Amino acid sequence: MLGKFLSMVIIDSCILPLALRFFAPMADLADSCPSARCCPQLSDDAWLRVGITRVVDDEPNGRAFLQSISPEWEDTPARSSFFDTLASERRLRFCREANAALCANMGLTLPDPLAAWPALKGFAVFAGDGHFHAAAVHDARDADGTKYATGHVYALNLRTHAMHHLDVGDQKARKKEHDMRTLKRQSPAALRFGTPTGTKVILVWDKAGIDFEWWLACKNNLGIYFISRPKENMVFTNGPENSYDAADPVNTGIVADELVAPATHMRYVRRVTFINPAKGETWQILTSEMTLPPGLIVKLYLMRWDIEKVYDEFKNKFFEKKAWASSATAKCMQAVFLCLAHNLMVLHERELRQEHGITNEAEDRRRAKRL
């Protein structure tokens, strides 16, 4: 398995180049992070490699992982040091900064699948969703003896496939925090994921991402627009219809583009109705964005499935199904390491494609079929 391969690769001269190439995008990232510090016992750079290798390694728990790499890796931290570092607020800030820098580099080097539609120029587009890990071994139980899964909210850049961790669910006031409550706790900068001022941001969410009052505030104050689907019990008052170019291939399947007023919010939002030509299914999409062709609104929502595929990767490729530790900081650290590992994999896949012509043809076919 790749995880074991990368942990052994550190000293095995036969396969050393693969590890060097896999981790190459991380070179010098530590030096550019404001929270980086000189730590002789376990450097920030070594901590990045330990955490990422923990994600891709095959061992089922932290103790077994540290034991498996200690004979080959001289920088292996002691078990107590590993778990203490997981709970370090400073290291978490550093890891977030490193992932943000890596995501920015991905935007400079990876092909942009949205570049084919000029109308999207000036928009950064992210798919967001919640994801759960099983409770950690030492997580507290409630009065009934129940441990609750740990919820996280992530966002995937649909231009680069770079993965960002937004936050862990409230560990104190909620047993299971709703996505919208997590979103409302975030700073404006966090919700824009490093997007430069002047560039609009589109967040594509499932039905858990609907709050029309908040959508309006995000649009007016932050330049953030939402795309989602209506819940079954929502009631709308029909407003004026929007004109669109039915002859444009991007609008294939569009049967309506109209403004509607939700019963709970008497400001118009946009509703696009789409019939899938292949399956005959009718979908309705809601958005606070008023200018893009309706077919692009639908296409962006369909691309939201990409983040579900990343979650499948977390669970069934990385085998990351359980929280590593109990503190909120440690749980966030694990989530950021998952993002770093995914982002390095995306860059490595690009290298394999460009230099060796190796592609994941089966997944490419599945994705084309979804879209």
PLM region descriptions:
Residues 1-284, 288-293:
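Conserved, well-structured functional cores that handle cations and Mg-NTP chemistry
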Residues 24, 309-312, 342:
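Generic structural signal for well-ordered, non-membrane alpha-helices
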Residues 90-100, 145, 226, 316-339:
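Compositionally biased, low-complexity linear motifs
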Residues 280, 302-309, 335, 339:
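Generic recognition of short, well-ordered alpha-helical interface segments
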Residues 296-298, 351-352:
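Short conserved micro-motifs at the rims of enzyme active sites and ligand-binding pockets
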Residues 297-325:
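Short amphipathic alpha-helical "interface-anchor" segments enriched in bulky aromatics
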Residues 320-370:
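Basic, amphipathic alpha-helical segments enriched in Lys/Arg and hydrophobic/aromatic residues
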